[in-house]
Amino acid sequence: MIFVKIFKKVKYSAILMHGEAVDEYEKLSGVRPKLSYLDKKPVLDVGYVSASHSGEYSVIAYSDKEVGVDVEKIRNVSFARYFMGEIGKPYSTERDFFREWTYRESRYKAYGISVNRATGRDIGLHPDFLLGYDLCVVGEGEILFSWSE
């Protein structure tokens, strides 16, 4: 199972977000996990954590398996100039560009590998409830969302 908590109007550095992840996990489970880093990737002694922030939102994902999360504010970019690595195709809208970007970022956070080295063990879930943003969660299992103002 993957638990995803979304915070509005909270801006953290990655290190502070990882500390917040420890606090949130303790609130959920009653157990205070120990946070460590493996190849610069945050790992809890009880599972995995991933964090991201953009614009007005911060997101933390927890799982007993590898997990990756990314949120990006959809903004005007010169996306016609951007090519996504080996895919080598321009995108027709900013939404398409950021959907691909967040999937690649989430996948890298979860497994440390690019989307082009597909394993078939995950999907990228893009819920549409954050207007003006793209959020992607990559991992295995059911995904539960929680919201905090």
How should each PLM-predicted stretch be described?
Residues M1-E149:
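Core catalytic alpha/beta fold that binds nucleotide/phospho-ligands
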